[in-house]
Amino acid sequence: MAFTGDELARMLQFKDKMISSAGSALRFEKVVQEAMASGIVLQHITCIKVRICDNSDILSDRQLRCLLINGLYPFEGRMSMFGVTEEWEGASAAPERQVVFLLSSTGQVLGYEDGVIFYLSPTFSDFWTTAMEFSCQNAILSNFIAQKSRDEYSDQFQKYFTRMRHTPISLTGVLPRRFQKVESGACVEEDARASMRPIQSDSFGAKGPFCWPTEELLQPSAKKDVGGTVCMALSCQEDNSARHCTIYGLTKTPGIKIMLSRHTQTDRSEAMCDAATQTEDVVDNSSETLFLGGNLVHQSILETEVQATAKNTFDVSDPRIDSVYDTTVVGAMATDDVGCKHVQGGASLAQEKPLKGYCIIATPSECKPNIHWLKSPENAVHESAAVLR
């Protein structure tokens, strides 16, 4: 399902209103009713669609209605329903699966399915960028609900949230031979001329060179260190078929920076397609907002250094990189002060001037994670994480 730019802007507007009003139950419920009347559907980071509504717009059971009125220990106050995600089987009268999302008066987000309540996130804003798991690790069972104190529940929920948000991702790769560190000056010219071949990619639907090396590389010198020249291929799995995009850059230091983005509301297929066809896209790293073809996409940009290891391999492991569900490799940045003045051409997001000392060289093609609906994130790293080759 693709959304137009106006539809995305309207969805993001309601989403921001809900986040800002989450501290007041009455104001939050009013915004939910407005969104329900407008037919707002928001996309979670795990790619499921959350239809914004209250309990008057679903087939609710008695236990859910009591939960909304009386609240639930260990949470204080009443609950407010703000959305539901459903799985339908044909033209049946009732959904095959229905998960209701609730907001407590103290700000925590819970999930409700078939009489079982699951803790999901400590805040409403964190809910949209955190993977969901429905297991005994975060279930609040009515039979054992009074056997723990509020502090014990708080510790349990914090451990769950930390595990979901801070599962590190390791990306490893080996540089192609012609871009590995040159030991003797005799090999410099051969490697440099080999790198003059334009790098082709049909990731964006049109074949053409991403960028060319500078003439500086064509002057061999025994003192010149071209070990900082980096060429890598990033690939993402989608429907068991790899999509490739080559990233090429010139640096003075033996390393690059990977930029990772967390999409919180967008139709990724449409957004990446727009990014490929637009030439005036703007990346504002300070406001953590990315404009793709006129569609506003909220994201959090992380930069992590790629450390050189033995035998010209590179390894990335950064605890700031959250779970595999909300991380997509979208570009590469030069780590030195050369900026873009030594880079000609480039992909659609390449800038003519350095962006805060860095330069976006290229972006991969559509990077929609291959995720099964509401599945546990265990063993999912190899399915949807981008890998370096």
From Swiss-Prot:
Q: Which UniProt keywords apply?
A: Host cytoplasm, Host nucleus, Host-virus interaction, Modulation of host cell apoptosis by virus
Source organism superkingdom = Viruses
KW RNA-binding (keyword) present: no
Q: List the disulfide bonds.
A: none
Q: Does the keyword Lipoprotein apply?
A: no
Q: Which one GO biological process term can you cite for this protein? A: symbiont-mediated perturbation of host apoptosis
Name its cellular compartments: Host cytoplasm; Host nucleus
Can you list the GO cellular component terms from the UniProt entry? host cell cytoplasm; host cell nucleus
What is its quaternary makeup?
Answer: Interacts with host MDM2; this interaction leads to the stabilization of host TP53.
Q: What does this protein do?
A: Plays a role in the inhibition of host apoptosis to facilitate efficient viral replication. Promotes stabilization and inactivation of host TP53 through interaction with host MDM2.
The record's similarity note reads: Belongs to the beta-herpesvirinae UL38 protein family.
Protein name per its UniProtKB record: Apoptosis inhibitor U19
The organism named in the record is Human herpesvirus 6B
